[in-house]
């Protein structure tokens, strides 16, 4: 059993005969025991794992919930929130679909959608096991942008079927955030959804990463006084994130001929057959 208060942890064994106290340094992700002895890597990993499980389980399982934005304290409120009052909002949306942004939460609601085929450093763990990650993204949306999120985990690997499922949810959301879908499927899915849907479709693993990397490289080059058009770049990896980063850097002015892309089989080049 692990107890966590601030930066201090207490790990008890199952028989409750041993107590080990740790002090966790969240900034440097390191941990020392109460007597100031640095813990082993295995101890640190296990302590962090237990802390994460406690965080996800208590006091309420999971990390997100639905909270009403209107009061519901009496019969009048009930009549306005549901039948018969709700019919007025429905009728206005029938007259003009854009009224959905006035009378519903659609304009501030994003669907974080995955099929769990490329989750963080975990790989293809499936939709159910990916749910904690999608909930975590919902926490980030709400905390840092005030945007509400429904996490949608879909048990479907066929790209065309996945496109159909996601596109069918357009009336619910103001935007779609594709998350942790394997390459090259993610490129195809995003492109088709953008062509088909009338709301923003954003693939976080591509464009979110590209924005951060692009900003870091541009600012780093400013610090050292170098020109983006004159430097050479080698990437380690040729997945969705890497290719999106390169696309943005080229748009920002980096010449394609100054870029070398590598993966498990070495340098990627036209005509290569291995792992292509």
Positions of PLM-derived features:
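Cationic, low-complexity basic patches in intrinsically disordered or flexible, solvent-exposed regions
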Residues: 19
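N-terminal ligand-binding/catalytic initiation module
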Residues: 32-201
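Single conserved hydrophobic/aromatic residue that forms the stacking wall/gate
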Residues: 1-13
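Short loop/turn elements that form and flank the Walker-type P-loop nucleotide-binding site
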Residues: 4-5, 105-107, 229
């Amino acid at each position: 059993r692990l107890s966590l208060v601030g930066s201090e942890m207490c790990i008890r064994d199952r028989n409750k005969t041993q107590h080990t106290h740790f002090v966790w340094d969240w900034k440097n992700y390191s941990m020392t025991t109460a007597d100031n002895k640095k813990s082993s890597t295995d101890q640190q990993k296990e302590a962090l794992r237990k802390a994460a499980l406690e965080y996800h389980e208590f006091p309420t399982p999971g990390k997100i919930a639905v909270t009403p934005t209107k009061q519901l304290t009496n019969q009048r409120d009930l009549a306005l929130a549901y039948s018969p009052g709700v019919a007025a909002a429905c009728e206005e949306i029938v007259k003009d679909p854009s009224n959905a942004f006035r009378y519903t939460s659609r304009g501030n609601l994003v669907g974080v959608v995955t099929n769990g085929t490329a989750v963080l450093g975990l790989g293809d763990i499936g939709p159910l096991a990916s749910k904690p990650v999608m909930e975590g993204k919902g926490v980030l949306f709400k905390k840092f942008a005030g945007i509400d999120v429904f996490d949608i985990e879909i048990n479907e690997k066929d790209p065309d079927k996945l496109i159909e499922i996601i596109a069918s949810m357009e009336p619910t959301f103001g935007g779609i955030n594709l998350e942790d879908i394997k390459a090259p499927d993610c490129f195809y899915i995003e492109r088709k959804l953008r062509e088909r849907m009338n709301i923003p479709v954003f693939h976080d693993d591509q464009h979110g990463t590209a924005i951060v990397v692009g900003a870091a490289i541009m600012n780093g080059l400013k610090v050292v006084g170098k020109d983006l058009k004159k430097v050479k770049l080698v990437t380690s990896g040729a997945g969705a994130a890497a290719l999106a980063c390169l696309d943005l850097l080229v748009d920002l002015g980096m010449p394609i001929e100054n870029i070398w892309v590598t993966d498990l089989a070495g340098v990627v080049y036209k005509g290569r057959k291995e792992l292509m």
